[in-house]
A protein has these predicted regions:
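Short glycine/proline-centered loop/turn elements that form peptide/ligand docking sites
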Residues: 189-193
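Juxtamembrane inter-helical linkers in multi-pass membrane proteins
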Residues: 17-29, 65-79
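The alpha-helix within a helix-turn-helix
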Residues: 197
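Glycine-rich helix-loop "coupling/hinge" segments at transmembrane-helix boundaries
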Residues: 14-17, 64-68, 233-262, 296-300
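Single conserved hydrophobic/aromatic residue that forms the stacking wall/gate
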Residues: 1-16, 20
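Membrane-water interface segments at the C-terminal ends of transmembrane alpha-helices
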Residues: 3-4, 34-64, 80-187, 204-206, ...
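Transmembrane alpha-helical segments of polytopic membrane transport and secretion proteins
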Residues: 14-43, 121-123, 284-300
Length: 300
């Protein structure tokens, strides 16, 4: 009976080194003074962030700030029509679609840029457009979509005021960071994989699904959660694109504050925080489980 060797054996170390030949593990020396200093610095930042979130949570629970500080859940009822739970559900739906479709499009695009060497000009063009969204504000993206799609003669006019245009705009808005993340992960893989697959006449798609995708699975998970959380909180990119049926939680929070319902706005903002924490927790559990089972060579 053949048993799998423990992770500490040279087999796993050899496998990891074969995949990432150019990587050298950095093991910093322990320094109690520096560690405590950095712990204190990070703790101060964490406390400030938690205080801001806690203040928003407190504002969402009090009856009438700052005159009546008794606690209540009535602000989560969202009495203003069109700015309540429907907006929250729309945001979750939009963020989910953005994360799923965006992860596929972005990682495949990064693979084309980094691994497909047949046409250097095409790779340069794709790389240029992949980096462009970083320099374009979300408001400009939203206005550009409106001016382009609102025309009745445009064949894409049917996606105007739908969930589809929100998803497409959000993917484009946050494309660059995710693209660079994917390219960085692909650069770390040894280029000999592609050379060997070509010499053995292995199709590109088999190489992608059997080697590249499993090795880069942590990066794929990171792209997914990045797109989801940013889609939940984005305002500038969607402020001109939503309709009455596709109002988002981030936009509703602003409108509630403009109408004087500060507590309702805080409650809506906290819903965004809740769902982001929840999805992040699920992402951590699933990714940890899958990585331990499929990537033992990483010495997790």
């Amino acid at each position: 009976m053949i048993r799998r060797p423990p992770r500490s054996t040279p087999l796993y170390s050899s496998a990891a080194s074969d995949v990432y030949k150019r990587q050298v593990v950095f093991n910093p020396k322990k320094s109690w003074g520096v560690d405590m200093l950095m712990l204190g610095y990070c703790s101060i930042i964490a406390i400030i962030i938690l205080l801001m979130i806690g203040m928003a949570q407190f504002g969402a629970l009090v009856k009438f700030w700052p005159y009546n500080l008794s606690l209540t859940l009535k602000h989560y009822h969202f009495e203003v029509a069109g700015l309540g739970w429907e907006s929250f559900y729309n945001s979750v739906e939009m963020a989910f679609y953005t994360a799923v479709f965006g992860t596929v499009v972005i990682f495949v695009g990064a693979y084309v840029v980094e691994k497909i060497k047949s046409d250097e000009k095409l790779r340069g063009i794709v790389q240029f457009f992949a980096l462009m969204p970083m320099a374009v504000p979300g408001v400009v993206l939203g206005l550009a979509y409106i001016f382009y799609i609102i025309s009745k003669e445009n064949p894409l006019n049917f996606i105007y005021a739908t969930m589809a245009i929100l998803v497409i705009n959000t993917i484009v808005h946050f494309y660059t960071v995710s693209h660079l993340t994917g390219v960085t992960a692909l650069k770390q893989m040894d280029k000999e994989f592609e050379a060997v697959s070509l010499s053995l006449k292995v199709p590109i798609y088999k190489m992608f699904f059997r080697v590249t995708l499993p090795v880069c699975l942590p990066t794929v998970f990171d792209i997914f959660i990045y797109l989801f959380c940013n889609a939940m909180t984005t305002v500038s990119g969607v402020i001109f694109l939503y309709s009455y049926d596709t109002t988002l939680a981030s936009v509703s929070s602003i409108h509630l504050d403009e109408q004087g319902d500060v507590a309702g706005a805080a409650a809506m903002a906290m819903l965004i925080v809740y769902i982001s924490f929840l999805v992040r927790g699920i992402h951590t559990i699933i990714s940890t489980f899958l990585l331990k089972r499929t990537q033992a060579w990483r010495n997790i």
